[in-house]
């Protein structure tokens, strides 16, 4: 494993560097005392360890912050898991966004036990520029047209941030100028908080993680076709249903409840996926937790997703984040907290490779990842597809959702409701159903 890390992970020189905070900003500095043994650790689970024991270990390892005095990443090779091993990787988000990190991790894998690299990394041969380490330059350089306009609007928000957020009517006045981007800015500025549930609150340091058994991707696609929805619609409606069932089991009210999720949107061209850095936007997706009818809930998720297509929210958020990066840290923290307080969860869906991969001679049976949270966001939802299967994972704050496995275990049941509904469809049917009739036909509300 250490050999693979040295040959394929550390080829990205940034991973030999640490972030050094200076007054008002931070810079990357090479760790002159770098030692791979500090970052690649070999441990073992006790006894006949399974999923529960590994979830407990991941929850424990994920809590303490990475050492800022060293490059902020770590590999834990865990022996004695289900007769094999597991690899737990922690990488600070300052190095790269999810799309770039997935590309980095896949560059370490092989297409067979003794096969060639599955996704070889061939960095462009050019002389490094002085501004290569500038996060702002990395964000601005590929932008043109609407992206640059988003940066300008983001800069406006940074300059006039307090006025706009404290007096939303000023944001509305901006929208009346006719710009689609400023209209989106008005929506963000006037957006209220989502429903107060046990998924929302100030997170503490202790976390809990859980993941579901994988679903066949072809089956998810078939259900989506039968019901007139996308794979994402199906999966997100199951997430909403599982969260609803969990709240109901806890005795919490669910009527009219909406949980809003921040969804990162990749804005990086695929040909530049090898580059590190963060280049993503954000959209706010509303999950209709208050809907009991699974078919109605599916169509509500679908409509919410459709309303975001073509939205300027992602590029506007990128502009805001990039402009924030050039502003004082106090303003960065304030605006980030404002964005975060309007949501209860971060939700990421990553399309993984659909063929088996090997790492250091061992076949990879499954992949899972978790996303960081900030502000009042206490839940991270992760969906990843790999080798013909799709996996659902959850990370929660121990203080207000100490048992994410109780949410996870309800995910499969919500999917089965949609399977039953699809099976009741006439042969060859594809498209919308009447939610009430469909629900009654399969015996669900």
Kindly give the residue locations of the regions a language model identified.
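Soluble acyl-CoA-dependent acyltransferase catalytic core bearing the H(X)4D motif
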Residues: 3-377, 381-444
């Amino acid at each position: 494993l250490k050999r693979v890390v040295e040959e394929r992970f550390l080829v990205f020189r940034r991973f030999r560097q640490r972030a050094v905070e200076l007054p008002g900003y931070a810079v990357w500095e090479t760790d002159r005392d770098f030692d791979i043994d500090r970052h690649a650790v070999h441990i073992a689970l006790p006894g006949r360890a399974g999923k529960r024991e590994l979830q407990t270990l991941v929850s424990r390892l994920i809590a303490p912050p990475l050492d800022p005095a060293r490059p902020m990443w770590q590999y834990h090779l865990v022996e004695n898991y289900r007769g094999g091993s597991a690899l737990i990787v922690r990488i600070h988000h300052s190095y790269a966004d999810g799309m770039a990190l997935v590309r980095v991790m896949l560059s370490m894998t092989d297409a067979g036990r003794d096969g060639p690299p599955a996704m070889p990394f061939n960095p462009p041969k050019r002389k490094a520029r002085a501004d290569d380490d500038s996060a702002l330059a990395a964000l601005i350089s590929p932008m043109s047209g609407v992206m640059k306009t988003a940066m300008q609007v983001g800069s406006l928000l940074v300059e006039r941030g307090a006025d706009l957020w404290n007096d939303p009517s000023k944001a509305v006045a901006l929208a009346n100028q006719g710009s689609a981007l400023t209209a989106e800015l008005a929506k963000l500025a006037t957006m209220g908080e989502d429903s107060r549930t046990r998924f929302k609150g100030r997170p503490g340091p202790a976390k809990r993680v859980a993941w579901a058994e994988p679903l066949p991707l072809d089956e998810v696609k078939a259900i989506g076709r039968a019901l007139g929805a996308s794979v994402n619609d199906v999966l997100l409606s199951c997430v909403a249903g599982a969260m609803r069932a969990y709240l109901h089991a806890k005795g919490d009210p669910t009527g009219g409840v909406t949980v809003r999720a921040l969804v990162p949107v990749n804005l990086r061209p695929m040909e530049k996926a090898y580059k590190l850095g963060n280049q993503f936007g954000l959209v706010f997706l509303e999950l209709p937790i208050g809907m009991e009818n699974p078919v109605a809930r599916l169509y509500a998720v679908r409509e919410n997703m459709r309303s975001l297509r073509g939205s300027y929210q992602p590029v506007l958020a990128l502009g805001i984040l990039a402009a924030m990066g050039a502003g004082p840290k106090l303003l960065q923290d304030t605006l980030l907290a404002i964005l975060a307080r309007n949501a209860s969860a971060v939700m990421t869906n990553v399309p993984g490779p659909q063929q088996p991969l090997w790492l250091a001679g061992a076949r990879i049976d499954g992949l899972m990842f978790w996303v960081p949270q900030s502000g009042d966001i206490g839940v991270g939802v992760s969906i990843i597809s790999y080798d013909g299967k799709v996996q659902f994972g959850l990370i929660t704050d121990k203080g207000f959702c100490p048992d994410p496995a109780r949410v996870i275990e309800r995910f499969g049941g919500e999917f089965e409701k949609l399977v039953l509904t699809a099976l009741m469809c006439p042969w060859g049917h594809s498209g919308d159903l009447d939610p009430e009739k469909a629900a009654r036909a399969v015996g669900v509300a």
